Amino acid sequence: MASSNTVLMRLVASAYSIAQKAGMIVRRVIAEGDLGIVEKTCATDLQTKADRLAQMSICSSLARKFPKLTIIGEEDLPSEEVDQELIEDSQWEEILKQPCPSQYSAIKEEDLVVWVDPLDGTKEYTEGLLDNVTVLIGIAYEGKAIAGVINQPYYNYEAGPDAVLGRTIWGVLGLGAFGFQLKEVPAGKHIITTTRSHSNKLVTDCVAAMNPDAVLRVGGAGNKIIQLIEGKASAYVFASPGCKKWDTCAPEVILHAVGGKLTDIHGNVLQYHKDVKHMNSAGVLATLRNYDYYASRVPESIKNALVP
């Protein structure tokens, strides 16, 4: 392990603070009462004022501190001057105390690609299903997701008025994942988490092929991976295009750092080069344990229907 004064660990420490700031913005927009909803491509593909402000905050804060990064965000925004109030320039000191895995110690700023989803679970956000919402900042090197930060702005929001709202989970491959308590679904139980708002026949047929004991239909890719690492679900199964690289980059790191696995429906690892296509065209299959069991149950007809 190398000193934490490396580009990667400084970037992760910054991303942690920046994700917290974005989470505050997400909460503030709800509190102010005007979500500013616009449809991007259809009624289930929405953008709100929180998406726009959070992305401005994240991308501008990262670009100021790390000007040579490649930053790819979900929302297309005009290159307007960003209000100073949206900029976060602090770093989470606890991360800077951690050693950098030696394989990443010499990484340069310009070698890294950051994938940003400023508000994962937008549809659920507009419907008041606030525990589905996450802020995702994923960091990739040579096409591989190697570090990630997930902020849950409304973690604890149903725990009463005195509860502390929000939490931030982070991880680096070779170091671990932090900010949560790792749990597993009881042995022999097959609980599937899948999409709430983007279902179709391929999705439902693939879920059924898993012979599940229960199916959880929730919003947000980040939220589904958190269900895996906290023992609420055994597998995340989404046999459809629809989810993008900014949805999976950060969550994949957290899952991989604790021994899980995330691939497309064919078992291919996802690539995060700056020039890669944004859509995960062949869906997502992710588990904390027993990946091979779930992968073996994906019907050939579904694989044939989904081209990587």
From Swiss-Prot:
GO cellular component, one term: cytosol
Residues at the catalytic site: D51 (proton acceptor), T122 (proton acceptor)
Keyword Metal-binding belongs to the record: yes
Catalytic activity reported: adenosine 3',5'-bisphosphate + H2O = AMP + phosphate; adenosine 2',5'-bisphosphate + H2O = AMP + phosphate; 3'-phosphoadenylyl sulfate + H2O = adenosine 5'-phosphosulfate + phosphate; 1D-myo-inositol 1,4-bisphosphate + H2O = 1D-myo-inositol 4-phosphate + phosphate
Cofactor dependency: Mg(2+)
Gene Ontology molecular-function annotations: 3'(2'),5'-bisphosphate nucleotidase activity; inositol-1,4-bisphosphate 1-phosphatase activity; metal ion binding
Binding site for Mg(2+) 2: D117, D120, D247
InterPro entries named in the record: CysQ/Inositol_MonoPase, Inositol_monoP_metal-BS, Inositol_monophosphatase-like, Inositol_monophosphatase_CS
Inhibition and activation profile: Is very sensitive to inhibition by Li(+) (IC(50)=0.3 mM for hydrolysis of PAP; IC(50)=0.6 mM for hydrolysis of inositol-1,4-bis-phosphate). Is not affected by high Na(+) concentrations.
Keywords: Acetylation, Hydrolase, Lithium, Magnesium, Metal-binding, Phosphoprotein
Binding site residues for Mg(2+) 3: E74
EC numbers: 3.1.3.7, 3.1.3.57
Keyword Phosphoprotein: yes
Additional observations: Since this enzyme is sensitive to subtherapeutic concentrations of lithium, it is a potential target of lithium therapy, which could explain some of the side effects of this therapy.
Role: Phosphatase that converts 3'(2')-phosphoadenosine 5'-phosphate (PAP) to AMP and inositol 1,4-bisphosphate (Ins(1,4)P2) to inositol 4-phosphate. Is also able to hydrolyze adenosine 3'-phosphate 5'-phosphosulfate (PAPS) to adenosine 5'-phosphosulfate (APS). Probably prevents the toxic accumulation of PAP, a compound which inhibits a variety of proteins, including PAPS-utilizing enzymes such as sulfotransferases, and RNA processing enzymes. Could also play a role in inositol recycling and phosphoinositide metabolism. Is not active on 3'-AMP, inositol-1-phosphate and inositol-1,4,5-triphosphate.
Alphabetized PANTHER family for the sequence: 3'(2'),5'-BISPHOSPHATE NUCLEOTIDASE 1 (PTHR43028:SF5)
Protein name: 3'(2'),5'-bisphosphate nucleotidase 1
Organism of origin: Homo sapiens
